[in-house]
């Protein structure tokens, strides 16, 4: 969980970013946000144009067109991530302190029900469209809880080889999850609800954020030792490593621009271009703000949203909350 937030938005033109040899990025606009408490993962709901922020004891909804706070969903304890099930217009929010998942209505911004999970500290959370299940990655018990979205009940528990972090689905029956304490990547078969492969990510250390290119079958793990590890999703072969900023916590891939993003605690956003399935190059390290480690990609606008805190003493009152829009000058 991060510190109270300053919200940043970075906007990138699809064509300009993909083809510019030396792109020049800058912060373009600022929005006030406000509010107290830490945060974790960010999620874009493209249907409502909402940025959903896991904000410690509540979900904050920010209008991605105006940058204004439009609502909050309270009554939570220590939330981490939000998985969207668009067909049902529901969100599933992992609550690490309550060992549960809160089901929210994405249109009314209300809590519908709570689902206790069979693990401790549910953190990363992902929807797998192939099975219709939501999976929570339980950081303190080393397992994944499987929730059937038709019944909103836990239907299986999957033993994992270590402490799970972020997870992604390929939409074809597999979920991939970084194993932070082992420097590994695990593959879950969502038909059998079992891990069917585990791959070593060395020289990557402490992988956190994870993204996927479902077309080229490439996985992007961002690591604490300033590396992005690129892995073949079918064979587990390491395709490449790419230098990124320090202290990453999230990764995103934009299929329209072929860009991979790493948001880093050192106040940079590393942008990597996928030239082809086996070749990758850094095109920019965009200054953001120290602490801006988590992000969301808006696929409609190709904008990147991040959050960070205004500098201040530990436990000091929150102030100077601002949304920043950045892109090519």
Predicted regions mapped to residue ranges:
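Bacterial N-terminal signal peptides
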Residues: 5-16
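Predominantly soluble domains enriched in secretory-pathway, periplasmic, or organellar proteins
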Residues: 17-329
């Amino acid at each position: 969980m991060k510190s109270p937030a300053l919200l940043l938005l970075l906007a990138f033109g699809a064509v300009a970013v993909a083809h510019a040899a030396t792109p020049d990025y800058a912060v373009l606009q600022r929005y006030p946000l406000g509010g107290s408490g830490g945060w974790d993962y960010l999620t874009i709901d493209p249907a409502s144009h909402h940025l959903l922020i896991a904000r410690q004891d509540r979900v904050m909804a920010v209008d991605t067109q105006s940058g204004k706070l439009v609502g909050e969903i309270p009554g939570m304890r220590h939330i981490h991530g939000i998985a969207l099930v668009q067909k049902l217009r529901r969100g599933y929010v992992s609550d690490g302190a309550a060992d549960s998942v809160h089901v929210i209505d994405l249109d009314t911004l209300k809590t519908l029900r709570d689902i206790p999970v069979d693990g401790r500290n549910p953190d990363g959370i992902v929807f797998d469209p192939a099975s219709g299940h939501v999976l929570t990655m339980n950081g303190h018990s080393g397992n994944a809880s499987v929730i059937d979205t038709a019944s909103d009940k836990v239907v299986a528990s999957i033993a994992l080889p270590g402490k799970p972090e972020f997870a992604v689905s390929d939409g074809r029956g597999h979920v991939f999850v970084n194993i932070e304490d082992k420097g590994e990547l695990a593959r879950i078969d969502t038909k059998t609800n079992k891990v069917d492969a585990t791959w070593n990510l060395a020289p990557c250390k402490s992988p956190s954020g994870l993204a996927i290119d479902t077309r080229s079958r490439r996985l992007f793990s961002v690591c604490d030792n300033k590396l992005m590890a690129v892995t073949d999703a079918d064979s587990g072969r390491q395709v490449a490593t790419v230098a990124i900023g320090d202290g990453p916590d999230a990764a995103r891939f934009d299929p329209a621009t072929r860009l991979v993003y790493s948001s880093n605690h050192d106040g940079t956003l590393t942008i990597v271009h996928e030239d082809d399935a086996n070749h990758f190059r850094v095109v920019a390290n965009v200054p953001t703000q120290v602490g801006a480690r988590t992000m969301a990609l808006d696929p409609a606008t190709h904008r990147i949203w991040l959050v960070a805190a205004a500098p201040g003493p530990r436990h000091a009152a929150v102030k100077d909350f601002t949304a920043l829009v950045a892109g090519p000058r």
